[in-house]
Amino acid sequence: MAKDIKFSEEARRSMLRGVDTLANAVKVTLGPKGRNVVLEKKFGSPLITNDGVTIAKEIELEDAFENMGAKLVAEVASKTNDVAGDGTTTATVLAQAMIREGLKNVTAGANPMGLRKGIEKAVTAAIEELKTISKPIEGKSSIAQVAAISAADEEVGQLIAEAMERVGNDGVITLEESKGFTTELDVVEGMQFDRGYASPYMITDSDKMEAVLDNPYILITDKKISNIQEILPVLEQVVQQGKPLLIIAEDVEGEALATLVVNKLRGTFNVVAVKAPGFGDRRKAMLEDIAILTGGEVITEELGRDLKSATVESLGRAGKVVVTKENTTVVEGIGNTQQIEARIGQIRAQLEETTSEFDREKLQERLAKLAGGVAVIKVGAATETELKERKLRIEDALNSTRAAVEEGIVAGGGTSLMNVYTKVASIVAEGDEATGINIVLRALEEPVRQIAINAGLEGSVVVERLKGEKVGVGFNAATGEWVNMLETGIVDPAKVTRSALQNAASVAAMFLTTEAVVADKPEPNAPAMPDMGGMGMGGMGGMM
């Protein structure tokens, strides 16, 4: 296929038009008084959102060169979202400012490589200063503030803070759509996995359709149990102890299941059988997790163990087990704390090494089940459109909060970027490098300027006043007041601000050093069908 090629100034100008189109659509959402953007959907109602990355991903431009520019900035938003989970609009605003300022200087004759060096120096200094001024997040109220700022909703802030307090920093917090209007929190403490009872005859509470076992023994195996003789020795020992039994196996079927059910109904003993969670290697790992949590052993042929040789000493124990049709929850396992900590450390190490997003998610789930628990925020709204928008905002707030726990918080509302201004301005450089540093300095002003513009104010006036204020004092666009941002609870996670700045600078530097752009030539439109000259079906009667 033939290619269309543009060089130097013409190439950069074409791409800049795409950058501006995308950034102008995204930046209207910045700040407490930012607006929404409506996205058309091929099916169903349109999506209304103020989430930068969602808007950026939707934008496709007709001109191939403009589209390439737009896609470069969309990558800034996407990468920031992957790393920090929020701050995508800030990243887009920073990228646009750096690209525009940079192009002015390249057009005026500056060397792009010199500009790139200056930009990299300035961003490195800014990030070091951000680390210095960031404060560790402490207590439930600080977490609530971070979440409330991101979601622009105090109620959501409180919910997320409560969820993190209950399940810990390693716990998993997921979002689900509620059937009602209200947004509420549901916390599952202990280890839960998605396998229910093998037979409904095993339930102990017919109203709730669940089996509750108090202080049970737990038999854990990766084998299929179809012959009752295999587990008879250990079953007799459990009956002598007068305790209920939970069996976790690959499957319990045939004669073994029938015998267990009959004896359960007769009242001989209280037993519930469930299938082992997961598949393949993940199943082995999850069974090992359950064994460590409950102080038991996995009875597997790989370790030379068979079910007939199992004793009560090789069984796990827990304070309580609740089994429903779909889930099993093990609460208060009596496993050795040191072994549990070692297992958590092992999973954390795997988390750092893995590159697969799916594996990362599954490892995070396993970590949460061992370390804390799982919290579910059920998002409610009056309409489906509002529900989607609300869910996106809460997702951002959740990511923002996790980022704050990792690297601490800085003053929000773009104030922290202005607080590193002096540090960046003090870098000694000459020529094009100095110009590169000035490009970053100009970009650092842009988020504050845009927040003020979205609030209906003159951005330049706010920026100039902020330069003269003490560190930490900023402009609260929601109220129009000048306040101490940290004390007022207007904060941003340091990780979000850092990622936005790094990713924006990276793409801007690449953009400025571009000298040629190659795109596919648009295919010519196919010629129209010739006129059939009145050849109707009537003239084809002889073919019948």
Curated annotation (Swiss-Prot):
GO molecular function: ATP binding; ATP-dependent protein folding chaperone; isomerase activity; unfolded protein binding
Keyword tags: ATP-binding, Chaperone, Cytoplasm, Isomerase, Nucleotide-binding, Stress response
Catalytic activity: ATP + H2O + a folded polypeptide = ADP + phosphate + an unfolded polypeptide
GO cellular component terms, semicolon-separated: cytoplasm
Keyword Chaperone: yes
Regions annotated as coiled coil: none
Induction: By heat shock.
Top-level division of the source organism's lineage: Bacteria
Compartment(s) of residence: Cytoplasm
SS bond partners: none
EC numbers on record: 5.6.1.7
InterPro entries according to UniProt: Chaperonin_Cpn60_CS (IPR018370), Cpn60/GroEL (IPR001844), Cpn60/GroEL/TCP-1 (IPR002423), GroEL-like_apical_dom_sf (IPR027409), GROEL-like_equatorial_sf (IPR027413), TCP-1-like_intermed_sf (IPR027410)
Subunit structure: Forms a cylinder of 14 subunits composed of two heptameric rings stacked back-to-back. Interacts with the co-chaperonin GroES.
HAMAP family noted in UniProt: CH60
Family from the record: Belongs to the chaperonin (HSP60) family.
PANTHER family given in the database record: 60 KDA HEAT SHOCK PROTEIN, MITOCHONDRIAL
Name this protein carries in UniProt: Chaperonin GroEL
UniProt organism field: Bacillus cereus
Gene: groEL
